[in-house]
Amino acid sequence: MSERTVTVSQLTNYLKNLLLQDHNLKNVLVRGEISNFKHHSSGHMYFTLKDEGASLRCVMFRNRNWNLDFSPQDGMDVIVQGVVGIFERAGLYQLYVEKMYSHGLGSLHLAFEQLKEKLAEEGIFNEEYKKTLPPFPKKIAVVTSPTGAAVRDMIVTISRRFPLTSILLIPVRVQGEYAASEIRAGIDYANSIDDIDVILVGRGGGSLEEIWPFNTEEVARAIFSSKAPVISCVGHETDFTISDFVSDLRAPTPTAAAELVVPDQVELKRQVSDYKHRLTKALYHKYRNLDQRVVELLDRPVMKNPYTLISERKKELEYLDQRLLREVYHLFKLKRNKYSSLVEQLDSLSPLKTLGRGYTFCQTHDGDIVRSVTDIEQEDILKLTFFDGSAKCLVKEKQEHHISEDHSNLNSLCNEEEDYDRQ
């Protein structure tokens, strides 16, 4: 054992934290007999809960007891729900009561809390399983007593609000020993009908014992398994039943359920009238804008005298046509002149041009070009090409001229060529 010394406060805080960390003590249900009850002027209630073998100090603060539907007294058998903690100043453990159920109803409240906790752990109450109600149901099944005021209120309200909806009454007992099984069977029967859109399950108000069938597990599971959406409508506004938690929608009263399940035809007519007015107004503004647009278009010069615009465009087209012809002709002329210049250049470089000035092109019989008199011999046959034809010649005689000789012969030949060109 540790020899470290602690203070009373430290030990008390340690024990307090131990109790707070214990999950089983955070939401505990305790049954016992009230003794030493005191309702303090502050509004808080102080009492002891006891049985044959032990007693437990309890406190129920004002913000928890203000809505109790009974007055606790000594000797009363109750079930309380709360958290176990330590009152540090006195060093005593006690129960901080959150809820209290009166004599005779304690077992029912206990059963209610236990079933609620069980189904909650299974996830049956989760929002992910809630089905959406159709906006305009065609057929509604009502599972309730055929003789109570609740069914009359629902039928009258549904017929008044949305007469297009048909109602199927499935009569069942809503209190007593066999009520739960009949309610479950009624829900199952409604689901066997293909065209049922919504199921209303409920009754008018009553005591806890009277509405107890709606706190049973078989009714809860029937609601959860329903293919059609279910509205729970037990006529009690302050407390909830298990059916309220598991259903797709909870209504505080049967009449409220009827108002929730169908739209109000008066409101629908008002909405249709409003939509009609808005549509008419939108169409009128659209028509007016289009009409104004037409007036503006008709007021334009092109619409007043379209032939003037056509005549102007025709003149522009003719002008562009003439301009195009001039440009094409000018471009053609430039290309033709350039072509003629190139032809003249090519012609000036042509051998035929030289032959046309009196020269000839000489080849041997084998086609070799004769560049000098030394390339031929007597009796050779030569081919002479002129600018306008050719001829074959036989060499009878050849004469050689030396380069060193007087240039007079060359000048004479040049003068002869110039005379020939002038001619």
Curated annotation (Swiss-Prot):
GO terms for cellular component: cytoplasm; exodeoxyribonuclease VII complex. GO terms for molecular function: exodeoxyribonuclease VII activity; nucleic acid binding. The gene is xseA. It comes from Natranaerobius thermophilus (strain ATCC BAA-1301 / DSM 18059 / JW/NM-WN-LF). It comes from the Bacteria. Its main location: cytoplasm. Keywords: Cytoplasm, Exonuclease, Hydrolase, Nuclease. The keyword S-adenosyl-L-methionine does not apply. This is Exodeoxyribonuclease 7 large subunit. It is found in: Cytoplasm. The keyword Cytoplasm applies. It is an enzyme of class 3 (hydrolase). One of its GO terms (biological process) is DNA catabolic process. It catalyses: Exonucleolytic cleavage in either 5'- to 3'- or 3'- to 5'-direction to yield nucleoside 5'-phosphates. Heterooligomer composed of large and small subunits. Pfam families: Exonuc_VII_L (PF02601), tRNA_anti_2 (PF13742). Its EC number is 3.1.11.6. Belongs to the XseA family. Bidirectionally degrades single-stranded DNA into large acid-insoluble oligonucleotides, which are then degraded further into small acid-soluble oligonucleotides.
